[in-house]
Amino acid sequence: IKYIVNTHGHVDHISGNADMKKKTGAKIIVHEADADMLVSTPAMILSMFRAKSSPAADITVKDGDIIRVGSVSLTVLHTPGHTAGGISLYSNGYVFTGDTLFVESVGRTDLPGGSWEVMVKAIREKLLTLPEDTVVLPGHNYGRMPTSTIGHEKRQNPFLR
């Protein structure tokens, strides 16, 4: 394991960073706008989730950056709205969408740093412009199936109509 890529800085996505980094030596990656979130999760939130605090990011990324792992290249798509630094990662017909786009749903925007308008704009401009057969791999399985496609989300996602 070379990298631990956080699609955003919420505790349910970063709480494994410390153990994973310790066990593997992998570098932690997050968007520059969410970097502070890794090291500033309130103690109460950590306690609620029985989570560990995260080490600081080793690498920060921005829109258009490429993360290379062996022969795989992941293109960073800045998809804010769930958090200011939310990212999706695109590679060869697959997109990891974190908590931005779910199967027939979208991420919540009522937490600090969230914005419905910003998220919908990011989804429309960065994700729905990908090829329709692009496989959507969300950060949580909140739909009736674990994955989807961009074409399916365009047609069936009630939040994007």
Regions found by a protein language model. Give the residues of each.
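Active-site HxH/HxHxD metal-binding segment of metal-dependent hydrolases
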Residues: I1-V69, R155
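Metallo-beta-lactamase
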Residues: P42-I45, A51, S73-H78, T83-R161
